[in-house]
Amino acid sequence: MAVIVLAAGAGTRMKSTTQKTLHSIGGRTLLSHSLHAAAGIDPARIVAVIGHGREQVGPAVAEVAEQLGRSIDTAIQEQQNGTGHAVQCAMEQLEGFEGTVVVTNADVPLLSPETLQELTATHDGASVTVLSVNQDNPTGYGRILRTNDGMVTAIVEEKDATEKQKEITEVNSGVFAFDAAILRDGLAQLNTDNAQGELYLTDVLSIARRAGHPVRAHIASDAAELAGVNDRVQLAAAGAELNRRTVTAAMRGGATIVDPATTWIDVDVQVGQDVTILPGTQLLGTTTIGDNAQIGPDTTLENVKVGEGAQVVRTHGFDSTIGPRAEVGPFTYIRPGTVLGEEGKLGGFVEAKKANIGRGSKVPHLTYVGDATIGEYSNIGASSVFVNYDGVNKHHTTVGSHVRTGSDSMFIAPVVVGDGAYSGAGTVIKEDVPPGALVVSGGKQRNVEGWVAKKRPGTPAAEAGEAAAKRVAEGGSPTSTPQADQE
């Protein structure tokens, strides 16, 4: 079996500098969806016909072929002269091929391998089999013409149809299965005697019928699979339908999705059992979610591996790893190359980039960790910064295990903090810290008495300070603020 995927059209209704089939839904381009479907029936050959934007589409075909681990040939349609001409170009790549040739389109992203398999099963023994679908509104589609006993005789395009024929609701999906020899013979007889002046692939069906060859139609059970994408409105509709199917599959696989309407999951995402996904979550790319994890609300993860039992709240992360039973968020930004270990924590308003954070270590609040390695069971105080950039190069910081650093610590890379070390609040760490040491960088605090009254006279601060000084002189409190009891 061979599959031809037609991807040469201009797609002018997309109004885009990007070729139509390279627009994406569900984490794949339209082209990628169609090539994955083609590969899903395990054909001996796949040929993609490219034309408009081929400098973009050609490399995209090669990329998908690499992802699939198989070869995909390309045929170039220099001038777009109809679907029949496109298939003629493809058949030049299939010289000498015998068997079934399936023809499909790169702008039908929901078409599944299962439907293609049903088509080829119906086709067994026929010369041509068209995949048809019943449409409530068939406007714009080619109509399937049948005899009184139900035999398919022809497909008539909308522009060539009579008013009576336009009332037919069974339409051509643009997907066919052909006997290779019948296809070659039919392509050789095509002409442009039609309203559009093009070579219609659908005319091969009529040619085969007139020659006495059996022609069949397989009516698709799921019309939504065959919805084409020609503009941005249809792109959005196809994306929404694909997402509905993906989200439904995740729920049937054992995940709880609290609000499917606000949850978006790409087709290559893997979601484990007993996962809970809260509203406003996007799982993109090749993200994987381990069993019993909780994701969201308002979380976007792209190419992130999340371990079992992890909790990720109001977080944006990509190209990173979150370990089992780790806690992330809220309002956390995880950048590429970050690995958060088992039972680790990245808390509120923490940003991590190329950070390897060991098992049980915590970065709870308001901290930037960049180009760093942190060992096991360490705690980084609030408002700390790993200062990794000298204006030209990035440098690495290493923090050992069981380290405790005070709030507002600055790690001036490159620097190493040994196991078990402590730092005082506000410490600027410029040099390596020995294991078990306490590092402090500030000198003795100096209070300049009366500075505010002298330098800011007449201000509310000066007046408050003078009043408090009188209270202190009389044995009272230095502050009007009630002081909490100290335990």
From Swiss-Prot:
The keyword Magnesium applies. Residues 254-487 are annotated as: N-acetyltransferase. GO terms for molecular function: glucosamine-1-phosphate N-acetyltransferase activity; magnesium ion binding; UDP-N-acetylglucosamine diphosphorylase activity. It catalyses: alpha-D-glucosamine 1-phosphate + acetyl-CoA = N-acetyl-alpha-D-glucosamine 1-phosphate + CoA + H(+); N-acetyl-alpha-D-glucosamine 1-phosphate + UTP + H(+) = UDP-N-acetyl-alpha-D-glucosamine + diphosphate. Pathway: Nucleotide-sugar biosynthesis; UDP-N-acetyl-alpha-D-glucosamine biosynthesis; N-acetyl-alpha-D-glucosamine 1-phosphate from alpha-D-glucosamine 6-phosphate (route II): step 2/2; Nucleotide-sugar biosynthesis; UDP-N-acetyl-alpha-D-glucosamine biosynthesis; UDP-N-acetyl-alpha-D-glucosamine from N-acetyl-alpha-D-glucosamine 1-phosphate: step 1/1; Bacterial outer membrane biogenesis; LPS lipid A biosynthesis. GO terms for biological process: cell morphogenesis; cell wall organization; lipid A biosynthetic process; peptidoglycan biosynthetic process; regulation of cell shape; UDP-N-acetylglucosamine biosynthetic process. Residues 233-253 are annotated as: Linker. Binds 1 Mg(2+) ion per subunit. Residues 453-487 are annotated as: Disordered. Pfam families: Hexapep, NTP_transf_3. Residues 1-232 are annotated as: Pyrophosphorylase. One of its GO terms (cellular component) is cytoplasm. It is an enzyme of class 2 (transferase). Residues 477-487 have a biased composition (Polar residues). Its EC number is 2.7.7.23, 2.3.1.157. It comes from the Bacteria. This is Bifunctional protein GlmU. It comes from Corynebacterium jeikeium (strain K411).
